[in-house]
A protein has these predicted regions:
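Glycine-rich beta-strand-centered segment in the early N-terminal region that forms part
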Residues: 6-69, 110-112
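Short, well-ordered coil/turn residues at beta-beta hairpins
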Residues: 54, 202-204
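C-terminal substrate-binding/catalytic core of Rossmann-like NAD(P)-dependent dehydrogenases/reductases
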Residues: 234-288
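A short acidic, Gly/Pro-enriched loop at the edge of an enzyme's catalytic core
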Residues: 193-201
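ADP-ribose/adenylate-binding Rossmann-like module
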Residues: 217-234, 248-249
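Mid-domain Rossmann-like dinucleotide-binding core that forms the NAD(H)/NADP(H) cofactor-binding site
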Residues: 104, 111-189
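Hydrophobic beta-strand signal
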Residues: 51-53, 141, 225, 249
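Short, well-ordered loop/turn sites that connect or cap secondary structure elements
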Residues: 45-46, 134, 218
Length: 298
């Protein structure tokens, strides 16, 4: 059973310079909501508090008795029992003012974090997960300047930051990087005549042609990590991949890490909240407007 009702009263519009989505925007998980009711007696103490919505434990959220290994590790994004989920017609989503979620799909937001800042908890957690794959890489080319990729960049530690470069292809890319204070950039013209420059591509765009354009910039035995999904079916240069033993791997959502001293799994959502609470990264410049819920028209 779903056990919590939450209320949303403001929508924030993303900075349009970073928006690659075609068509209408609908609320996904990037939500901060207030708890207004719950059937869980123990959880009633949290009525009035704010939460972020995240897939932490799908098995418990949908009352699936045999909890999968991923949900036990707070990796609900990779739940092995997703096909067993049964949805009810009163959960709602989109631009709903009220919707129902399980407590296992939420994480309490500290009072110190403003709601408009809290909407970045989940996107930052995606960046944290991306960085997890890059610790051993020596020189990384980032393709695609977007909200997620910028949050990823801003949350990087010094060791990875020194190895990461955003690809700048257009004047628009250049202006965005300048406006958002992104210093780790490499211009398309500079690397066009170079070969085997990078050992990793982190792609936030998902375009076959764009990835193929830069395959020659990779050293043998390099890696391509795909985060973006613009092309429904990627068509990569398999000859180049095979002849240079280049591996391709997808990255999706957020994950967790095991804390040996505390004997528990700490989700990337929790790490993201700590980053925002500390003021380590700036996010205000990624919001262009705030819209009242009552002013939204379908």
């Amino acid at each position: 059973d779903v056990d919590k009702v939450m209320n949303i009263n403001q929508l924030l519009k993303r900075n349009q310079n970073l928006n690659r989505r075609i068509g209408k925007d609908y609320l996904g998980h990037e939500v901060v909501a207030e708890i207004v009711d719950t059937k869980d007696e123990e959880f009633k103490k949290n009525i009035g508090k704010r939460v972020v919505v995240a897939d932490i434990n799908i098995c418990k959220s949908f009352n699936i008795n045999e909890e999968c290994e991923n949900c036990k590790k707070k990796r609900g994004v990779f739940c092995l029992n997703k096909k067993k989920r049964k949805f009810k017609n009163n959960t709602y989503g989109g631009f709903s003012e009220y919707f129902v979620r399980s407590k296992h799909q939420t994480f309490l937001l500290p009072d110190e974090i403003d709601s408009k800042i809290g909407i970045f908890v989940e996107p930052i957690s995606l960046g944290i997960n991306c960085a997890r794959f890059l610790r051993k890489n020596k020189k990384i080319l980032g393709i695609g300047i977007s909200t997620i990729s910028i949050l990823f960049y801003r949350s990087l530690n010094k060791d990875i930051l020194e190895k990461f470069y955003f690809l700048v292809e257009t004047e628009k890319d250049k202006n965005i990087c300048k406006k958002l204070n992104i210093n780790n950039i490499i211009y398309k013209d500079k690397i066009n005549n170079e070969f085997q420059t990078f050992d990793t591509i982190l792609d936030f765009f998902g375009s076959s042609s764009k990835i193929n354009d830069y395959l020659l910039k990779l050293k043998p035995k390099s890696k391509i990590y795909l985060f973006g999904v613009e092309d429904e079916k990627l068509s990569l240069n398999y000859h180049q991949l095979i002849s240079n033993e280049i591996s391709v791997q997808g990255i999706h959502g957020y994950s967790s890490q095991y804390l040996e001293k505390e004997k528990r799994y700490k989700t990337d959502i929790e790490n993201s909240i700590e980053i925002l609470k500390s003021g380590k990264i700036k996010v205000d410049d990624l919001i262009s407007d705030t819209i009242s819920q009552k002013d939204v028209k379908n």
